[in-house]
From Swiss-Prot:
NCBIfam families: serS (TIGR00414). Gene3D superfamilies: Bira Bifunctional Protein, Domain 2, Serine-tRNA synthetase, tRNA binding domain. This is Serine--tRNA ligase. It comes from the Bacteria. Pfam families: Seryl_tRNA_N, tRNA-synt_2b. The gene is serS. One of its GO terms (biological process) is selenocysteine biosynthetic process. GO terms for cellular component: cytoplasm.
Length: 425
């Protein structure tokens, strides 16, 4: 959410953000509704002033004038009461439009329509040079008996998965490694819920706009979040912190759920795109200072790259264009990790800086050293999302006999084992 005063004073900048982010919003309609609401509030305030002035006249009025003044007060009160529903309706309508206003991208963000217009910044790590025909993720899992996609589909339908044996241990290992890695870098580990209220998804910016991707529990006013960012973002909703309490840095672990409503037919096979997964999410609350925010952005990015380097996985860093960065973000980078069977990089991490856009929605402010109340800035980035990360892990580290080499960083979490599986080819 942007400051309404900023929108009034900078309509061209907001209109351009709406255009380059492909947001369906009529800014002229919003501004007209704002003017109408201001006029209605002024009318209400004038009537309240008149009613208060009239009330002061009643005790001093003559017996002849008093009944008329009393009646006038009643009439004004009734008129004000009649305006209350109209005032609430106009306030709610304006708020719903304000929730759709996108943030202003930082200078230098490439303008584009979708992911095809994203810009590659760099590549890291060497691509594997196999001297054998490599298997894909599903072939590795099935040959080792590490997954049962057929049976779990009877339980949960498509886009579900069941890991067994070493693959299940590998998933736990990589998640624990990510939590330890981030904890050692000063991030507080959180084990948080995926069950959230609707306003929590509004606070994070997923609503309005992403309703089709979210599971809702029938009979309850609860939904299933797709990332720990959602509940963490609302932990301090409505609170006032002091400047010395910031920054707050978290490594949030949670189950995550996504309906993948817009992904029909894409990545149905295997572990890339599933409805339920586990995720470690980096989340930062910092002061309302863009320079500080950008430093945290680089740190979150460095953490994600450090995790992938420790896992010995080749990857590339992408700068997202305006049309592929989401409404609330001023800057966004994706990290894509190499998947040998597809001969391409696949997204595994998204690093985002949102300025005060989320904090305005949650009402989270802090008092600076001068006593001024400011909205905090928020950032987030994936730590590890599983089982997706298992795809490049299994494929890049497979060996000629069908076993999988364990990266050194994960061996302490797997009893010191250097290889998973049995020779199957």
């Amino acid at each position: 959410m942007l400051d309404l005063k900023f929108i009034r004073e900078n309509p061209d900048a907001v209109r351009e953000a709406i255009r380059v982010k492909n947001v369906a919003l009529d800014l002229d309609d919003l501004l007209q509704r704002d003017r109408d609401l201001v006029a209605l509030k002024q009318r209400v305030e004038a009537m309240q002033t008149e009613r208060n002035a009239n009330a002061k006249l009643v005790p001093k009025a003559s017996p002849e004038d008093r009944p008329g003044l009393i009646q006038k007060g009643k009439d004004l009160s009734e008129d004000l009461k009649a305006l209350e529903p109209q005032l609430r309706e106009q306030e709610d309508a304006l708020k719903q439009l304000l929730l759709r206003v996108p943030n202003i991208p930082l200078p230098g963000v490439p303008v584009g329509k979708d992911e095809d217009d994203n810009v590659e910044l760099r590549r890291e790590g060497e691509l594997p040079g196999f001297d054998f025909t490599p298997l894909d993720q599903v072939e590795i899992l099935e040959k080792q008996g590490w997954a049962d996609f057929e049976r779990v589909a009877r339980v949960s339908g498509s886009r579900s998965y069941l890991l067994k044996g070493d693959a299940a241990l590998l998933e736990m290992a990589v998640l624990m490694f990510a939590l330890d890695f981030l904890s050692q870098r000063g991030f507080t580990p959180l084990s948080t819920t995926a069950l959230v209220r609707r306003e929590t998804l509004v606070n994070s910016g997923h609503f309005p706009g992403d309703e089709e991707s979210v599971y809702k529990l029938e009979g309850d006013e609860l939904l299933l979040a797709g990332t720990a960012e959602v509940p963490i973002n609302s932990l301090y909703a409505g609170e006032q912190l002091s400047a010395d309490e910031l920054p707050l840095t978290f490594a949030g672990f949670s189950a995550a759920f996504r309906r993948e409503a817009g992904s029909a037919g894409r990545d149905v096979r295997g572990l890339i795109r599933v409805h339920e997964f586990r995720k470690v999410e980096q989340y930062v609350l910092c002061r309302a200072d863009q320079e500080e925010g950008l430093k945290w952005f680089e740190r979150l990015l460095s953490n994600a790259e450090g995790l992938l380097q420790a896992l010995e996985l080749p990857y590339r860093v992408i700068q997202n264009c305006t049309g592929d960065m989401g409404a609330g973000k001023v800057l966004m980078y994706d990290i894509e990790t190499w998947v040998p069977s597809e001969q391409k990089y696949r997204e595994t991490h998204s690093c985002s800086y949102l300025g005060d856009w989320q904090a305005r929605r949650t009402g989270l402010r802090y008092r600076d050293e001068h006593g001024k109340l400011l909205y905090a800035h928020t950032l987030n980035n994936t730590g590890i999302a599983s089982p997706r990360i298992l795809v490049p892990l299994l494929e890049n580290h497979q060996q000629a006999d069908g076993t999988v080499r364990v990266p050194a960083a994960l061996r302490p979490y797997l009893g010191g084992r250097e290889v998973l599986g049995q020779p199957v080819r």
